[in-house]
A protein has these predicted regions:
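Gly/Ala-rich phosphate-binding loop of Rossmann-like dinucleotide-binding domains
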Residues: 2
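Short coil/turn segments at beta-strand junctions that form active-site/ligand-binding loops
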Residues: 6, 67-70, 95
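Short beta-strand-to-loop acidic/aromatic patch adjacent to the donor-nucleotide binding site
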Residues: 68-81
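Residues that form or flank phosphate/diphosphate-binding pockets in enzymes
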Residues: 17-18, 80
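Short beta-strand/loop segment that forms part of the nucleotide-sugar
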Residues: 6-17, 38
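Catalytic-site signature of metal-activated, phosphate-bearing donor transferases
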Residues: 48-59, 79-226
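Active-site-proximal specificity loops/subdomain of glycosyltransferases
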Residues: 18-70
């Protein structure tokens, strides 16, 4: 995300995989980023109290960001092309516009790249919880999905617009709580390229689908602790 994003807050909770140490070291090196430790475990299913709800954790972290500032919400299992991300900050023309980012869920198995078969044959077009917005909105609310409790942001009186191109790689299995999951409905990279040939060069730069580059991005995660 550097140097596109030069300041912000990094929320974390209940880390036992070395993430806390990485975050603290990063914030020490780049003091314009503030580490925010949430004092409760976040539980997606059968939460004992609201303090353990994911949306409450999001609101706690968001509370450290000043109102009336532009905010982008990102997750730890995304790796960004900084130039593309920076360009996307110029998409909104008013504080009433919200940029919805697209993504592909990449899965690496035995050094081979696949896409999870989500959305339109692996392409999630301006979908999900990945936004650029002006922070004059209401707090996060709970969102129930498949029995789990997540977060949603009610962006009232806002106009949603799509990103212009894919700006990041999303590796959902890089999160520790997901690394035991097995996905059977996977799309080989070559099949994705063939199916979405119309998107390559328009919504997706070809280099974003280069297998060697994707594997290099994936190897940036410290998976040895897993």
């Amino acid at each position: 995300m550097l140097p596109a994003i030069q300041r912000g807050v990094i929320g974390f909770n209940d880390c036992d995989d070395g993430s806390k140490e990485v975050i603290l070291e990063f914030c020490k090196k780049f003091p314009s980023f503030i580490p925010i430790s949430y004092p409760y475990e976040v539980i997606l299913k059968d939460c004992p109290s609201l303090w353990h709800q994911f949306y409450h954790y999001c609101n706690y972290t968001l509370s450290f960001i000043p109102k009336n500032e532009w905010v982008i919400k990102i997750d730890c299992d995304h790796i960004y092309d900084a130039k593309k991300l920076y360009k996307s900050f110029y998409i909104p023309k008013s504080i009433k516009e919200v940029v919805m980012y697209s993504r592909i869920n990449f899965v690496v198995q035995d050094f081979e790249v696949f896409m999870r078969n989500d959305g339109d044959f692996g392409f999630l077009d301006a979908w999900g919880d990945h936004w650029l917005f002006y922070n004059d909105c209401e707090p996060f609310e709970i969102w129930q999905y498949n029995g789990d409790a997540y977060e949603t942001l009610k962006l009232k009186d806002k106009h949603y617009i799509k990103d212009k191109e894919l700006v990041q790689w999303h590796f959902p299995l890089a999160k520790k709580r997901r690394n035991a999951l097995v996905y059977n409905d996977l799309i080989p990279l070559k099949d994705f390229k063939k199916h979405h040939a119309d998107l390559i060069g328009t919504r997706i730069e070809e280099s974003m689908l280069d297998e060697k580059r994707i594997l290099e991005m994936y190897q940036k995660f410290n998976l040895a602790e897993r």
